[in-house]
Amino acid sequence: MTGSIFEGKWQYVDHTTGLQPMQSFSFDDMYCHLVGQGNDAVVRTWVHNHVVILGIHDARLPYLAEGIEYLNNKGYGAIVRNSGGLGVVLDAGVLNISLIFKGDISFSIDAGYEYMYELVQEMFASYGKRIEAKEITRSYCPGSYDLSIDGKKFAGISQRRVKGGIAVQIYLCIEGSGSERAELMRQFYDIALRGEVTKFHYPDIDSSCMASLEELLETELSVEEVLFKLLFAMKTLGATLSNNEMTNDMWTLYNIYFERMIERNSKLKINQEG
């Protein structure tokens, strides 16, 4: 990749504190809409503590209510997101990054994933570890652009397109235990499936195939440090970063997308707070 989409003006939006998960996905849709209309590209960071973000397929689990009850008993809330197909674990040690830029139907899905892969490689280049993009089949939310080191997954990427804008979203497991997060999801699927055969194949999770970056890099690493690595990498790849305030028109548009998220989740009657 040439890094060409990184060259030029980007708005940096720091949402690492103070938001609920449904707000995050609503903001990404709003920024997609605006970027599609010609606004500057956006890089947005977000952190949510103790919540499982379920995918569309998870909403069809035969014993979803029991699975949600298990998560709640473990101190985790749950919501259904508007991108991606399966559940992921978020907590204070997981940094989410959204790259939001303009793109039409000719812009391939893989190209969007490659840009995020390029960015993450730049962020952690100094550690000298090879980061691979390939499916880790026994991880939670497996996909062809799972990011791993030595076969252990630390990140997953999803993509959403709204009104001519593209949001490529990644979760980076930075601090803590990757295998403990994976074990939470393994138990969730065990409870929510109860061994039933379904048309959709849910992941058969092996907790040992997931790890955090501080485990894989064998060094102490914090979300705050990685935020600085992100901004430095964006500038290295050619981005000019700025911060802009929300306007009244932006809030109006945001509220439209937020209402859609509320409607999607209200049908499930699940505990979002844990």
From Swiss-Prot:
Keywords, in A-Z order: Acyltransferase, Transferase
GO BP annotations, alphabetical order: lipoate biosynthetic process; protein modification process
Marked site (Lowers pKa of active site Cys) residue numbers: 153
Transmembrane segments: none
Listed pathway(s): Protein modification; protein lipoylation via endogenous pathway; protein N(6)-(lipoyl)lysine from octanoyl-[acyl-carrier-protein]
Gene3D superfamilies: Bira Bifunctional Protein, Domain 2 (3.30.930.10)
Any one GO molecular function term: lipoyl(octanoyl) transferase activity
Top-level taxon in the UniProt lineage: Bacteria
Assigned EC number: 2.3.1.204
Domain named BPL/LPL catalytic: residues: 37-242
Principal EC category: transferase
Record: active site: 141 (acyl-thioester intermediate)
Protein's UniProt keywords contain Amino-acid biosynthesis: no
InterPro entries: aa-tRNA-synth_II/BPL/LPL, BPL_LPL_catalytic, LipL, Octanoyltrans_LipM/LipL
Catalytic activity annotation: N(6)-octanoyl-L-lysyl-[glycine-cleavage complex H protein] + L-lysyl-[lipoyl-carrier protein] = N(6)-octanoyl-L-lysyl-[lipoyl-carrier protein] + L-lysyl-[glycine-cleavage complex H protein]
Record-stated family: Belongs to the octanoyltransferase LipL family.
Note from the entry: The reaction proceeds via a thioester-linked acyl-enzyme intermediate.
Described function: Catalyzes the amidotransfer (transamidation) of the octanoyl moiety from octanoyl-GcvH to the lipoyl domain of the E2 subunit of lipoate-dependent enzymes.
HAMAP family in the record: LipL
Protein name: Octanoyl-[GcvH]:protein N-octanoyltransferase
Native source organism of the sequence: Macrococcus caseolyticus (strain JCSC5402) (Macrococcoides caseolyticum)
Protein's gene: lipL
